[in-house]
Amino acid sequence: MPKIQIRILDSRLGNEIPLPHYATPGAAGLDLRACLDASLVLQPGETRLIPTGFAIHIGDPDLAAVLLPRSGLGHKHGIVLGNLVGLIDSDYQGQVLVSCWNRGPEPFEIAVGERIAQMVFVPVVQVSFEQVEAFAESRRAEGGFGHTGRH
């Protein structure tokens, strides 16, 4: 299991507010919690940056982290990420912030310590481009956006 460096920026993290952790042995994402001074109400259409109380340094250029919404918050309450998916590069060392967007019709209260997102570590492959005049023919060619059919 790779080791990722973490700096605790909020003394409540690891005490009153749990550290990021996997909820089950099969979980792909670490739960991230709102390290707020007080609960806040996210109005419909409003987006706010929510601190997590920690910074990470992945260090390994073959890894990155993605921040994803929690499915229940999105489905039941319309709370998703304002940037849809957050990307944390291996050389980033600042606080992990979660952009929360209320796309639902009702105000939503985010409590101190509430689970607001999940972080998944993924492998990274950097590529170089080879410029060509034409591509070798493929069955799909330029078809996209539903081109392969509905069923």
Curated annotation (Swiss-Prot):
InterPro entries: dUTPase (IPR008181), dUTPase-like (IPR029054), dUTPase-like_sf (IPR036157), dUTPase_trimeric (IPR033704). It comes from the Bacteria. Substrate binds at R70, S71, G72, N83, L87, I88, D89. It catalyses: dUTP + H2O = dUMP + diphosphate + H(+). Belongs to the dUTPase family. The keyword RNA-binding does not apply. This is Deoxyuridine 5'-triphosphate nucleotidohydrolase. GO terms for biological process: dUMP biosynthetic process; dUTP catabolic process. Keywords: Hydrolase, Magnesium, Metal-binding, Nucleotide metabolism. Its cofactor is Mg(2+). This enzyme is involved in nucleotide metabolism: it produces dUMP, the immediate precursor of thymidine nucleotides and it decreases the intracellular concentration of dUTP so that uracil cannot be incorporated into DNA. SUPFAM superfamilies: dUTPase-like (SSF51283). Pfam families: dUTPase. Pathway: Pyrimidine metabolism; dUMP biosynthesis; dUMP from dCTP (dUTP route): step 2/2. The gene is dut.
